[in-house]
C-alpha cells in the first residue's frame, strides 16, 4: 500500500513502514506528523485518485532526524579577468517514518 502526498508544495511517494526524505520542517511540527493532502492511494491494485485530494484520508508519520545531504559545489570562472568564484551548499533534510495510511 502506498500513497502520493503533497508536503510543503512537493509530492512524495509514501509507503507504510518506510522512511521518507523531505525538505527540513520547522521544530514546532516535529512530534507527531499528520498530512491530509493525499493525492492518490493504491491498496492492492485498487487506486483512489483525489480531485485534487482524496476525501477523508490521512497519513500519520513520526519524526526521526535531520541530516545534511552531500555538498553541491558551484564554480564560476571568467576567462582573462583573473576572477573566479567557488561556493558550496549542503541542503538539510528531515527523515520521517510513515506509520500508517488512513482512508
Swiss-Prot record:
User: Which domain of life does the protein's organism represent?
Assistant: Bacteria
Xref: InterPro entries: bL21-like, bL21-like_sf, Ribosomal_bL21, Ribosomal_bL21_CS
Q: Which UniProt keywords apply?
A: Ribonucleoprotein, Ribosomal protein, RNA-binding, rRNA-binding
Q: Does the keyword rRNA-binding apply?
A: yes
Biological process per Gene Ontology, one example term? translation
Q: Which residues form the signal peptide?
A: none
What molecular function terms (GO) are annotated for this protein?
rRNA binding; structural constituent of ribosome
User: What GO CC annotations are associated with the protein?
Assistant: cytoplasm; ribonucleoprotein complex; ribosome
In terms of Pfam families, this protein maps to:
Ribosomal_L21p
Q: How does it assemble?
A: Part of the 50S ribosomal subunit. Contacts protein L20.
Q: Which family does it belong to?
A: Belongs to the bacterial ribosomal protein bL21 family.
| Listed HAMAP family | Ribosomal_bL21
Role description? This protein binds to 23S rRNA in the presence of protein L20.
From the Swiss-Prot or TrEMBL record, give the protein name: Large ribosomal subunit protein bL21
Q: What is the organism of origin for this protein?
A: Borrelia garinii subsp. bavariensis (strain ATCC BAA-2496 / DSM 23469 / PBi) (Borreliella bavariensis)
- Name the gene for this chain: rplU
